[in-house]
């Protein structure tokens, strides 16, 4: 079905008029071949149908730049945007349309493709078992453990370490568990995506990974849809191959992209200027991320918190869908504690004795109680000093500071910056280290020995060197 005219171009939103009686379906992809005025070069832009305007016209969202376009002709593809799936995607980097952007061979025309808009699995297809995913990162495994097939949110403002934490999780889980990973870069820095690709190539992890990018320099249409493109690739490995798949989304800023085009689409803005369909769009994505009786998709999502305000509609809407939250705190990063995970604000529904076991649960709660008590004492210390505390409170502060530093750890992906080897700590070793620290076994070791180390044995060795 062809069309010959665009009624208007409003940045990323394009109105298209069809011949009388011809009408594309909602979410269909239109291919628009247009001429750029500056250099008279033909460029093909993909448009996604968003709204029917009546009078044989539709309003669409462009997946590419519309700058300088003035001569138009195009066709309705008769189907939604689709992306390649299966083995052909492993080791490759794609854009939102499933086109390879890694300078490798183009994706073969006969390779399997799936549409990016799909229904969530039916209720009777879902799995009800709960299994813990070991990450090798102490603060995560101890205090906010991740669930296989769950949805995990990494919350933090700009520059507190969301991307580095995601990179470490990709590295650790790929090296230790060997599962397939799909990385969706949504509105992130191109430099970070490039660094991640080369790091994954150097480590060999890229062979079991697929990457999809819609970076911050791209139009909002691409940033809105790229998370769906990555999820579609992950779903294929789950549903057709019966595999456990990890979906990394950095970050869930497609909500911000939606707010950019919402007013142009003619929708009444909602709170803080966001689209009124925010909750619906979020639900359509999140409900597809789940465990079925065949396989699972475990999603780890970096969630940008505008101005560190957790009441902003974008992070607030995401909260309802998550099984675990990892909150990154700027004050901890300023103290040199990395990862800067807030041990008191981070949560997981898996942290219960029935799921993680009695010992793990007991140690985790004791760690949180000690850190909470230390937090309550900080105001007194700031005003009156340590000398005014009771002996019992002094001991709490003494141990809490060591525990706080022991929650930090060197990352493999940060070796080039720190000059120190990264560490993967099994859950059993993590529990053992914190249990002995709570019992006062290492009270005589200096605080600095606990900073940026892995197992408790490394603390002992570092303590001997600094003694």
Swiss-Prot record:
The answer on whether this UniProt entry bears the keyword Membrane reads yes
What reaction gets catalysed by this protein? Answer: ATP + H2O + 4 H(+)(in) = ADP + phosphate + 5 H(+)(out)
- Principal subcellular localisation of the protein: membrane
In terms of CDD domains, this protein maps to:
ATP-synt_F1_beta_C, F1-ATPase_beta_CD
The reply to whether Translocase figures as a keyword in the UniProt entry is yes
Report the GO molecular function annotations. ATP binding; ATP hydrolysis activity; proton-transporting ATP synthase activity, rotational mechanism
Q: Which compartment or compartments is the protein found in?
A: Cell membrane
The record ties this protein, via Gene3D superfamilies, to: 2.40.10.170, Bovine Mitochondrial F1-atpase, Atp Synthase Beta Chain, Chain D, domain 3 (1.10.1140.10), P-loop containing nucleotide triphosphate hydrolases (3.40.50.300)
Name the GO cellular-component terms: plasma membrane; proton-transporting ATP synthase complex
Highest taxon of the source? Answer: Bacteria
Q: Sorted alphabetically, which keywords does the UniProt record give?
A: ATP synthesis, ATP-binding, Cell membrane, CF(1), Hydrogen ion transport, Ion transport, Membrane, Nucleotide-binding, Translocase, Transport
Stated membrane topology is:
Peripheral membrane protein
Enumerate the residues binding ATP. Answer: 156-163
* EC number(s) given by UniProt: 7.1.2.2
What does the function comment of this entry state? Produces ATP from ADP in the presence of a proton gradient across the membrane. The catalytic sites are hosted primarily by the beta subunits.
Family, per the entry?
Belongs to the ATPase alpha/beta chains family.
What quaternary structure, including any partners, is listed in this protein's UniProt entry? F-type ATPases have 2 components, CF(1) - the catalytic core - and CF(0) - the membrane proton channel. CF(1) has five subunits: alpha(3), beta(3), gamma(1), delta(1), epsilon(1). CF(0) has three main subunits: a(1), b(2) and c(9-12). The alpha and beta chains form an alternating ring which encloses part of the gamma chain. CF(1) is attached to CF(0) by a central stalk formed by the gamma and epsilon chains, while a peripheral stalk is formed by the delta and b chains.
User: What name does this protein carry?
Assistant: ATP synthase subunit beta
Q: Which gene encodes it?
A: atpD
């Amino acid at each position: 079905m062809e069309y010959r005219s665009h009624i208007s171009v409003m940045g990323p939103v394009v109105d298209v008029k069809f011949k009388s009686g011809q009408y594309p379906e909602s979410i269909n992809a239109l291919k628009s071949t247009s001429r750029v005025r500056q250099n008279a070069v033909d460029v093909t832009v993909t448009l996604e149908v968003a709204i029917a305007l009546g009078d044989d016209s539709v309003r669409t969202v462009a997946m590419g730049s519309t700058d300088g376009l003035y001569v138009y002709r195009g066709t309705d593809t008769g189907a939604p945007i689709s992306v390649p799936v299966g083995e052909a995607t492993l080791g490759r980097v794609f854009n939102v349309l499933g086109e390879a952007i890694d300078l490798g061979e183009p994706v073969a025309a006969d390779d399997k493709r799936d549409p990016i808009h799909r229904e969530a699995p039916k209720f009777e297809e879902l799995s009800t078992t709960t299994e813990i995913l070991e990450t090798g990162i102490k603060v995560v495994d101890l205090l906010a453990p991740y669930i296989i097939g769950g949805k995990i949110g990494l919350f933090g403002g700009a520059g507190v370490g969301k991307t580095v934490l995601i990179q470490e999780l990709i590295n650790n889980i790929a090296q230790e568990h060997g599962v397939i990973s799909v990385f969706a870069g949504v509105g992130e820095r191109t430099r970070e995506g490039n660094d991640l690709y080369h790091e994954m190539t150097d480590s060999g992890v890229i062979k079991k990974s697929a990457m999809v990018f819609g970076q911050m320099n791209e139009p909002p249409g691409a940033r809105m849809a790229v998370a769906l493109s990555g999820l579609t690739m992950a779903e294929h490995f789950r549903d057709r191959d019966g595999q456990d798949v990890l979906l990394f989304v950095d970050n869930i800023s497609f909500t911000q992209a939606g707010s950019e085009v919402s007013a142009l689409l003619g929708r009444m803005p909602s709170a803080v200027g966001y689209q009124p369909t925010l909750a619906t769009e979020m639900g359509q994505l999140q409900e597809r991320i789940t465990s079925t009786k065949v396989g699972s998709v475990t999603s780890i999502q970096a969630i940008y918190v505008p101005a560190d305000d957790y009441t902003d509609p974008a992070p607030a809407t995401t909260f309802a869908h998550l099984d675990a939250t990892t909150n990154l705190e700027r004050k901890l990063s300023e103290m040199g504690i990395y990862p800067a995970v807030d041990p008191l604000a981070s949560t997981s529904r898996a942290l219960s004795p029935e799921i993680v076991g009695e010992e793990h649960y007991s140690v985790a709660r004791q760690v949180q109680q000690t850190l909470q008590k230390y937090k309550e004492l900080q105001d007194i210390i700031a005003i009156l000093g340590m000398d005014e505390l009771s002996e019992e409170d002094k001991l709490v502060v003494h141990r809490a500071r060591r525990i706080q530093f022991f929650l930090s750890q060197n990352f493999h992906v940060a070796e080039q910056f720190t000059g120190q080897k990264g560490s993967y700590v099994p859950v059993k070793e993590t529990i053992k280290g914190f249990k002995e620290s709570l019992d006062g076994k290492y009270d005589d070791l200096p605080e600095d020995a606990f900073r940026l180390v892995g197992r408790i044995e490394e603390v002992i060795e570092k303590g001997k060197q600094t003694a």
